[in-house]
Amino acid sequence: DTYIVVNKGYIGENIYGGGYAGTVYNTKVEVTEEEYNQIYVGLNVFGGGKGVSATVYNTTNVLIDLKLDMEVTEEEVSTAEITSGQTKVEVEILNTYSKILGSVYGGGDLGQVGQGVINTSNNTAAISKEGTTYVEIKNGYIEGSVFGGGSGVPTVEKYELRMGTIYGSTRTIVNGGYIKGNVYGGGTQSRVYFSNKDDASIIYATNVLIEEKEEKIVINGSVFGGGDRGNSATTNASVPTTIGDVLVTIITFFSELTFMN
């Protein structure tokens, strides 16, 4: 097993819970700021490893908890500005001493979580070892997006179908913080295959009461139960796949909303 803890410091590129083309059983990555010790991550945080042959057999666990103070104001806008009944949210970030300039992934950078073989004829997978990713965002500034799955976007390698695949399930929880991009239950241009009819990927965006103080959540983009298709410039832009049921739950201080797909 591997356990990475970052409490302060400057990391110019990526953080990987797994290995570089290597294999591990479980990974745990904690990027947690203590006593306002600045943490700066120049690129991304991955629960899994780097490279198409990198594998995490069992589980990945990623926790992000950075200091962030922000003021969030919601106000009704006039009909002259926008469609009647809609609101406008103003966000003032009071400090960004610590930040992640890229995205956060439960899976790997081309690497897999769990083990299986993809059947291209019917877009299913025979799973020999089921894996699970856990991502929890407690607080902090994230410039990119949050993914329960992995990244299947090659840079110099030839594209392979298994890149960034999760053979199992994903769990993503957002308790607070500012996410400039989107939140996905799946990965980016990668696949999540589940072994039975349970949830293929689950994403929670929660706004809970902690120590008598309501934690603020701002997601500048959208929330998706599935994955990100990427852009038209990539050769594998049409591959994000989630096999199984999708449950999206948004929990606020006032109510709980559940959407089934």
Where in the sequence are the language-model features?
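Surface-exposed loop/turn motifs in large extracellular/passenger domains
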Residues: D1-N14, G19-S145, G150-N261
